[in-house]
Amino acid sequence: MNVKKSLCSAFLLTIVLGTAAPALVSANETTTQATTVVAPEATTTSEATTGLPAETTQTIDALTSTTEVSTTVDATTESEPNTEDSETAALEKAGILEAIIGKDDQYRVKNTTVHPYRSVVYLQMTFGNQTYVGSGVMIAPNLVLTAGHNIYNRETGAWASSVIAIPGRNDNSSPFGTYSSSTYYTFRQFKTEGNVIPSNYDIAVVKLNKNVSSKVGYLPLAYAVSRGQRLQIPGFPAYTDSKFGKMYTAYGTVDGVNGHLIGHLIDAESGNSGSPILNSKNEIVGIHTAGNYTIRPYGNYNWGTRINSSVLGMISHSKKTNEGSLNIATNKETKTGKTYRLYNPGARRHLFTQNLDEAQVLTTRGWKFEGLSFTTVSKGAPVYRLYGKTMKEHLYTTSKAERDALVRRGDWNAEGIAFYSGGKKPVYRLYNPGLRIHLYSSDANEVKVLKTRGWKYEGITFYTQ
């Protein structure tokens, strides 16, 4: 395997995000390994330092019971003893882990075919001509939960073009096969909030092109997590050649927690982004996303995005449709002319947009999302959108002359083509001189009533389907 380690070639993804080696890809189902480009990622040790762990290869064969469970809706506690001493002793005695040396508290998982490790997924993602690696976990026969920045680059605004998933990868072995995906979901606010680290929304679902082997199973999700709780984080660190493609796990405790984030001091490094954060029942309580960041009042920790009702909502959404919504973005959402309306109660203004990213941002700024208003054609007469700096409202027109005249006045900004006019359903424009606002309606009866209440009818402004 040809492996290239480059800090710069990773789109600076690992510098900006702190913990996730670049990786995103789709490919035909096969058990062969792909050539990968790996970039370093920030590492935080149990002392919360940013230095690299001492280079030691430690090995862990997941702790197994005599009877293996192939699916894990009811996860067992077979892999994690109650105390740190018993954890290491039991794992070493079972031949699952190699001894810990130095500051690196990650253990090599030697047997990745046992519960819960067979459900931990090596991810390889492609952005353009670059390939990156990360981790994930099976949560359904065809769904992998991972970090949002593994599949969406906030610096470039690009989705991964493809993802390869290998459950239970063990060095050059793919015991359950190799799977591909080109459909992903994340929170829309992860796209629109900028490079916030750690992010409350840095979590994603990868939908595989087919179900994985029934032997893989998947892990359940859990809400409950508290400070001091014992956790483990299995995944695929890739900072050094000696660890690349091998599964490691590490144990530690929760040091800070809020409604969206889990702060911990468990060792993680490049490639661990997307690793599941597991409790003693092997339930997923979070996804590891960022390393060595400080958030007051919690402190300087590695961070993970916590499982909550919003995450469950995104997972449910991914099972039903490839389309996006106000809060959930997907790389497969189509621009089919759907036009959404928002209302600002303070300004008493309406706005129309076909951009759900814009709509989501506006809902954080006092606008109320009113849902789908109408559907426009893909080609036709352009409908221009302008913003009045004095009137603080948006205006829509198909007239270039009106657009240009308003721009020349100096208090209107042209914002480009909003959508296209076409179809048989007219949308009327009215103006209220007292309120100094425009209103758009496709309801002829509403227009008739408004004309008797001080609204000035300005005609048909465009047509919709």
What role is predicted for each listed range?
Residues 289-332:
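C-terminal cap/linker of serine protease catalytic domains
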Residues 90-118, 122-133, 139, 152, ...:
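Conserved catalytic-core segment of clan PA serine endopeptidases
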Residues 199-268, 272, 302, 310-315:
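Chymotrypsin/trypsin-fold serine protease catalytic domain
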